[in-house]
């Protein structure tokens, strides 16, 4: 990803940028109960990986709520929201917002996901907003790195891709 900004200030992304056709690297993150979760735990399903800087901000909150709403119409699709938030904060936020169709996962401990998918904002140690779709065979079929972290992803493009 070349030029990325956060509130119009340039930032540096660390890690390996992913492209359509790449194998999706397995990663280790934490679930809300502090158990380890891996991409491989979702084998056999299409995965939408919705990456947000912090679940407690406006755009991130709207993004997660939107994907939770859309999940009711998606067969054999698992939506994962990954951020650097602590699992406790994610659990509290999900309960307060009625989020029950999205798995919220934390990359705060090792930044393993962020490094492998090229979304760590070096200056902030947050994840840059992005969306990845990974098929049943763990191939990346859709990628959107947002050039301005505070913008919304293209929800319609993601949904159109899933409904092909």
Curated annotation (Swiss-Prot):
GO molecular function: thioredoxin peroxidase activity
Annotated catalysed reactions: a hydroperoxide + [thioredoxin]-dithiol = an alcohol + [thioredoxin]-disulfide + H2O
InterPro entries, alphabetized: Redoxin (IPR013740), Thioredoxin-like_sf (IPR036249), Thioredoxin_domain (IPR013766), TPX (IPR002065), Tpx_CS (IPR018219), Tpx_Peroxidase_subfamily (IPR050455)
Record keywords, A-Z: Antioxidant, Disulfide bond, Oxidoreductase, Peroxidase, Redox-active center
Domain Thioredoxin, first and last residues per copy: 18-164
One Pfam assignment: Redoxin
CDD domains: PRX_Atyp2cys
PROSITE patterns from the UniProt entry: THIOREDOXIN_2, TPX
Enzyme Commission identifier(s): 1.11.1.24
Superkingdom of origin: Bacteria
Active-site feature positions: 60
Coiled coil spans: none
Top EC class, one word: oxidoreductase
Additional note from the record: The active site is a conserved redox-active cysteine residue, the peroxidatic cysteine (C(P)), which makes the nucleophilic attack on the peroxide substrate. The peroxide oxidizes the C(P)-SH to cysteine sulfenic acid (C(P)-SOH), which then reacts with another cysteine residue, the resolving cysteine (C(R)), to form a disulfide bridge. The disulfide is subsequently reduced by an appropriate electron donor to complete the catalytic cycle. In this atypical 2-Cys peroxiredoxin, C(R) is present in the same subunit to form an intramolecular disulfide.
NCBIfam families attached to this UniProt entry: PRK00522.1
Family to which this protein belongs: Belongs to the peroxiredoxin family. Tpx subfamily.
Subunit (UniProt): Homodimer.
Primary role: Thiol-specific peroxidase that catalyzes the reduction of hydrogen peroxide and organic hydroperoxides to water and alcohols, respectively. Plays a role in cell protection against oxidative stress by detoxifying peroxides.
Protein name: Thiol peroxidase
Biological classification of the source: Bacteria, Bacillati, Bacillota, Bacilli, Bacillales
